Amino acid sequence: GMTAEEIEKYINQIAFSSAEEFLEKYKDDKAAIIGHFGLGFYSSFMVSKKVEIVTKSYKEGAVPMKWSCDGSPEYTLEETEKADRGTDIILYIDDENRDFLNKDKINGLLTKYCKFLPVPIAFGKKQEWKDGKYVDTAEDNVINDVLPAWVRKPADLKDEDYKKFYRDL
């Protein structure tokens, strides 16, 4: 999670320094902005009419904060309620991008782009076949391998590990 000061530093200062010139430069080709420094998070505005960050730092006495922006250089930053430390990013998807809310589309994108990230990425719950249909279990459905073959010692790998890695590519 972040403090209000960290939000100001990492979200606002980096984001909005030269933001107006940046937006003017890419106004006709939104897709051209992907990959530019600091725009991983800011690409969320390509599909959203509004983005909120609800966050609480691990630091002693941290106050939960909510940052909200509609994609313009204007934003709000206010105290909020959040029991646990960490950060939630909430996207309010615009009408023309509602297909990104489709479960299969999300799963496909996460699998394609997050398959080998070093932290677990959970999407939904694992399912099991029960009474003629699939039902969710209590276990998170982790879509990535946090210890892929290339980070493990060759002596620790079995033939099946290599085959799984090849299939995952």
Regions inferred by a protein language model and the residue ranges of each:
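GHKL/Bergerat-fold ATPase module in large chromosome/replication-associated machines
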Residues: 33, 51-74, 95-97, 104-169
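GHKL (Bergerat-fold) ATPase N-terminal catalytic module, capturing the glycine-rich phosphate-binding loop
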Residues: 1-95, 99-100, 108, 115
